[in-house]
Amino acid sequence: MDVTDISTITPLELISLEEPPATKEGAIEFLLDLAVDAGRVDDRDAALDALLEREGEATTGVGFGIGIPHAKTDAVSKPTVAFARSAEGIDFDAMDDKPAKLLFMILVPAAGGEDHLQILSALSRSLMHEDVREKLLEAESKQTVQDVLAEVVE
C-alpha cells in the first residue's frame, strides 16, 4: 500500500476540527472513535488496548505540540491515520513539556511493520516545520487539513 496517499490513509471522516477531550486517554479514544465510526476498525477494544499498551512503553508526545499515539494491531486491516487538534493542548508527557495541540493516531495491521514506520517518519519529518504546524492549527476545513498533509507527506 502507498502510505503517502493521504486520501486513502486519512479520508475526511478521519479528520476532526472539534475539540477533543482534555486528557491523553480521552483524546486517544476520541481519535479511535473517528476510525471506528468510519468503519476502519474491526475491534475497538483490541485497538484501544494496543494504543494504551504502546503509550505505556514510551510517550508518544514527540514535542513541538505534537502527539502521535500509534500501534500495530489486527484490529485494523489497512493503515489508518486520524487527526484532531486541541486549542488548549493536552498533556502527552512530551520531552519538551509542551502540551500537544496536533494529534495524529496511527493504526496499522500487525503485519504492516514497514507501513507503520513509513507513516510515522513521514509525519514526524513534516511536522518539524513550524509552517506546517501553523497551517494545520489554522485550517478551517477538513479538506484543508487533508490538503496540507498531502502536500508535506511524501
UniProtKB/Swiss-Prot annotation:
Enzyme active site: 70
Induction record: Expression is highly up-regulated in presence of fructose.
Coiled coil start-end: none
Xref: Gene3D superfamilies: Mannitol-specific EII, Chain A (3.40.930.10)
Leader sequence segment: none
Gene Ontology CC annotations of this record: cytoplasm; membrane
Note: PTS-type transport systems are very rare in archaea.
Name assigned to this protein: PTS system fructose-specific EIIA component
Organism: Haloferax volcanii (strain ATCC 29605 / DSM 3757 / JCM 8879 / NBRC 14742 / NCIMB 2012 / VKM B-1768 / DS2) (Halobacterium volcanii)
